[in-house]
């Protein structure tokens, strides 16, 4: 458990707040970053452009890890009717296309969908959720099931799909502008020019979270960049960070509660969907995003193009 925590913190520090030795490592790995960038760029070419007759919106980011894509996708679904979410379904134990939710009915298990897809499935305003490695097939299935708008979670690099690309920029930026493994970027930073809209935190959207202080709670989370929850660390008796998408085990969580003489798990909804059947008392950290007019109006303008 401590290894998981140390691993996550080391990665966060390496990409965002590196010490002297981590900076040295980043420069040593720079040749690999150049090679990675070359193949990443190559992968964006030589594919036929696919155009859909209904709105397709992509919410993505250039950097490694979470920047708030999930709450932003949820925020879009709250603003517009008939939204289906299509995503890869990272860390799911299934392959191919799965309809996770259709018209408010959940149709598969957590292991088939993955944690992010199941989190979307519990969102009332989202009409459908589909996981598919092939995003084109996922989009086609969504429109077949009656979607009015498809929102793609983490599909900025899918340049063969004609879509409205929203690129998220968090207040917390990587220390270096390098691609992996020297930096946190999955594509070279100049690729941000290919976005239709760069959404800046504070200007185009507001991020907020809430949870009541509970001295009888242990905060556990398996999200990318757990330091996003820093304001809530003092609200629990102890905090434990695991790798993104980590599969919690009931016994280890029981041991954590016993160790700190607590009776409640404090976690995000993404974490909750993985432990909800364990029978623990849980306290949810609400993570939400509110769209500002600048972003809301841009999306409305794009959607209206399909109404003509």
Curated annotation (Swiss-Prot):
Keyword Nucleotide-binding included in the entry's annotation: yes
* Pathway as given in its UniProt record: Glycolipid biosynthesis; lipid IV(A) biosynthesis; lipid IV(A) from (3R)-3-hydroxytetradecanoyl-[acyl-carrier-protein] and UDP-N-acetyl-alpha-D-glucosamine: step 6/6
User: Which UniProt keywords are present, listed alphabetically?
Assistant: ATP-binding, Kinase, Lipid A biosynthesis, Lipid biosynthesis, Lipid metabolism, Nucleotide-binding, Transferase
Q: Any idea of its EC number?
A: 2.7.1.130
Q: Which reaction does it catalyse?
A: a lipid A disaccharide + ATP = a lipid IVA + ADP + H(+)
- GO cellular-component terms in the record? plasma membrane
Instruction: State the family named in the UniProt similarity comment for this chain.
Output: Belongs to the LpxK family.
Instruction: Please give the name of this protein.
Output: Tetraacyldisaccharide 4'-kinase
Entry's InterPro entries? LpxK
Q: What does this protein do?
A: Transfers the gamma-phosphate of ATP to the 4'-position of a tetraacyldisaccharide 1-phosphate intermediate (termed DS-1-P) to form tetraacyldisaccharide 1,4'-bis-phosphate (lipid IVA).
A single GO molecular-function term is:
ATP binding
Pfam families xrefs: LpxK
Q: Which organism is it from?
A: Campylobacter jejuni subsp. jejuni serotype O:2 (strain ATCC 700819 / NCTC 11168)
Q: State if ATP-binding is listed as a keyword.
A: yes
> Gene encoding it?
lpxK
The entry marks the following residues as binding ATP, namely 63-70
PANTHER family, alphabetized: TETRAACYLDISACCHARIDE 4'-KINASE (PTHR42724), TETRAACYLDISACCHARIDE 4'-KINASE, MITOCHONDRIAL-RELATED (PTHR42724:SF1)
